[in-house]
Amino acid sequence: MNLEDYQKAGVDIFDKLHLDSYPISIKYIRDLENEIPAGVRRPIDSGEKMSICQAFTYARRFKQKLCITSADNFCTPSSVGHGWVPLSVKEFTESQIRQKWSKDVQAEKRRAEHIYASNFKNVIELAYRGVIVSPLMETPVIPDSIMIYCDGPKLTYIINALNYEHKRKYRIQSTFEGFGESCSKGGFMPFVTRKAQIVIPGTGDRSFAGIQDHELGIGMPGSFIFYVLENLFQTGSGQGLKFPLRQLLPKLDENLTPGFRYMREVIDKKMNEAK
């Protein structure tokens, strides 16, 4: 697939699902001198700092094209988590202990063992130095990952599409922590693991990026968008899962409440008297 195919896919998924914001193209880069396309802005060049989740919001709501690096990013844990700076596991763990995200030192060490310690060195050795973020329909680069924010029913349609053939490649495998949800699970983990990830926006997303209470999300390897479009709305073969969502409506009568029932009796009496 070429760049135009991805841009068209961005338009198609936006239109078909009636999304409230644009799907996001995410591209990881190693060479800051040569891999940033014309028209892509670095916040630091205008004296700003910006987190990755904020860049996602600017891309999906305002169609901005941005490059975030360690120098641009005030959210230092995400710079470390993406391998942009060569901190040690010990140093990163100490920063998280000082943040008091976990109950105590032992809790944070258990978190490290479970979440990030085993792959810490591998991520740094990937040698990425930044990320290009843009609306998919106007992306200047072929994306490594695509992130879509949406409400619950629309997310269900995407999940149905990915699971339509139950192929191992497209299975969704997610864990949840409440931190680094959009930047990590929406972009970096799908790129590294080649697996789609459900995103429940976390602490930083809610605090920094203006994500609404009803919004959820999904991150996927870039090429998965074509599989989603191919299978969108196929699940159920018309049995209530088309768009907009078809929901069962209860069959009710006036016996639902005492007031309804009384009013029906009065109406019927008056109608009979008028005959």
Where are the predicted features?
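Acidic, serine/proline-rich low-complexity intrinsically disordered regions
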Residues: 4-275
